[in-house]
Amino acid sequence: ICIINNDVEVTKDWLKPIKERLNNYPNSIIQPKILDLNNANYFEYAGAAGGFIDKYGYPYCRGRIFDTIEKDNNQYADNEIFWSSGACMFLSKKIFIDLGGFDKTFFAHMEEIDFCWRAFNHGYSIYYISSSKVYHQGAATIKLNSSKTYLNYRNSLFMLTKNLPLKSLVNTIIIRLIMDILSSFRFLIRGEVSNFLSIYKAHLDYYINVKKLLSNRNNYINKPNYFKINSIVYKYFILGKKKFFHL
């Protein structure tokens, strides 16, 4: 099956390399190259050339880290990734059903990352195919608002609690709390009071629901090797590493 947003435009023969990969590796989840419909030479914010997360659940992509979006120079080859964008994702119906689909409690934002993390824990592979290309209207054109900020921060905490190895959960959540407090003051300094408050609303909602989240953790193995770098926040904001190949 293909999960695709209604603001995605496909290209000629885009399905051929996807079908070849699925025929050879039916237990794969696949993402094509996602470019910006409004700026066709650049990657698109939501997915780019495939996604990853750091130790604390902050997402980033090959071709896009935070607000730095790279020009597409075919610099990212076919490779295994950690998460596929929900803007365009291919997988078998069996995988989608076996994993229970997207988590409805997320409502919107980060549900595809949670889904791919569950797939990773179950032993499925997520793969990027550069020769399949689509264009997405996308997230970069949507101004950040307090609702989106709330859902992004809340759902990230939900996702961590569902998928982290239990032994590292408490320490990771504590560090995330500290990092999110620092992030909230960044909004406050810029005068974005509603976004500032949304982070605390997200944490409040998380703590209200944490017991339920813990009781609903699945019985599969929660793998510890889900991240490649400890902190994308530190790499990007402190060390100034703005592009994936700098990491």
Briefly describe each language-model feature range.
Residues I1-E9:
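Short beta-strand-to-loop acidic/aromatic patch adjacent to the donor-nucleotide binding site
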Residues I3, I29-L37, R62, I129, ...:
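Short glycine/serine/threonine-enriched helix-capping/active-site loop
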Residues V8-Y58:
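Conserved donor NDP-sugar-binding/catalytic core segment of glycosyltransferases
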Residues K55-C61, F66-L91, I113-F115, A140-L144, ...:
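A recurrent flexible, glycine/aromatic-enriched loop bordering the glycosyltransferase active site
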Residues T68-I81, L214-L247:
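Glycine-rich phosphate/pyrophosphate-binding loop
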Residues Y76, F82-K133:
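A short, conserved alpha-helix in the catalytic core of glycosyltransferases
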Residues S125-F227, S231:
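Active-site-adjacent helix/loop segment of glycosyltransferases
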